[in-house]
Regions:
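Polyanion-engaging groove/track-forming segments
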Residues: 97-98, 110, 127-130, 134, ...
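A surface-exposed partner-binding patch
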Residues: 1-109, 180, 186-207
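Membrane topogenic helices and adjacent juxtamembrane segments
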Residues: 1-11, 119, 146-177, 193-207
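Compact, glycine/acidic-enriched structural inserts
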Residues: 116-160
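Compositionally biased amphipathic helical and low-complexity segments enriched in hydrophobic
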Residues: 71, 84, 142-145, 168
Length: 207
């Protein structure tokens, strides 16, 4: 557990590939990055470590995460004011900044703020009535990468005899990994898992 946390706090390409497979990372050259992705920490992480460009399934299908398009298309860019309902319909001024999609989780898009580097959730179902903002995910793309790696490490324990215990430890690990953010992303994921695990564990105890 301590080794997992140390690796998740400072994820390397080697560790992430041990979680998701050799060749699974999108590691663009500096010139390949979007110009409006201005946050230096994000740019450095992408060009030196890389971000998982994967479709997560199997043990991790509970996350329903897909970032596979990064390698072929790069991150989708959009005006965050437009996404999150902060722009009036008659405002045709140029975007002040951009946010970049680095994957989808369930029905939400994970949007990295191009200026400050934080990761927010965008709900496309709320776009047309100023309800696109669905909460915080992580303080940085680096932290999101570490959290995805942790999920990969915990996955087999969720299939074991004590999934609720594993889930509680996973929640604590996510909180310790990114203490500045109460992640709405993992709250949604873990609440759904808890609903699934509780009856399954009760059946196991009764048998």
């Amino acid at each position: 557990m301590n080794e997992w946390m140390a690796a998740a706090r400072n994820p390397t390409a080697e560790w992430l590939e041990s979680c998701f497979g050799v060749g699974s990372l999108w590691r663009p050259a500096e010139a390949e990055l979007p110009e409006r992705l201005e946050h230096e920490g994000t740019r450095e992480f992408l060009t030196t470590v890389g971000f998982p460009a994967v479709r997560i399934d199997g043990f991790l299908d509970f996350i329903d995460f897909d970032s596979s398009r990064l390698k072929t298309e790069g991150p989708w860019a959009e005006d965050p004011d437009e996404l999150f309902g902060q722009r009036t319909p008659d405002d045709d001024s140029p975007p002040r900044s951009y946010a970049f999609e680095f994957g989808k989780c369930q029905e939400f898009s994970l949007m990295v703020d191009g200026v400050v580097g934080c990761v927010d959730l965008y709900d496309p179902n709320g776009w047309d009535h100023a309800a696109g903002y669905a909460g915080e995910a992580h303080s940085s793309l680096k932290a999101l990468s570490g959290a995805l790696g942790l999920a990969a490490q915990f996955a087999q324990r969720f299939e074991g005899p004590e999934p609720l215990k594993a889930l509680a430890e996973f929640r604590t690990a996510i909180e310790d990994l990114d203490p500045l953010v109460e992640s709405d992303l993992w709250e949604k994921v873990t609440e759904a898992l808890e609903e699934e695990f509780e009856p399954a564990e009760e059946i196991g105890q009764d048998s």
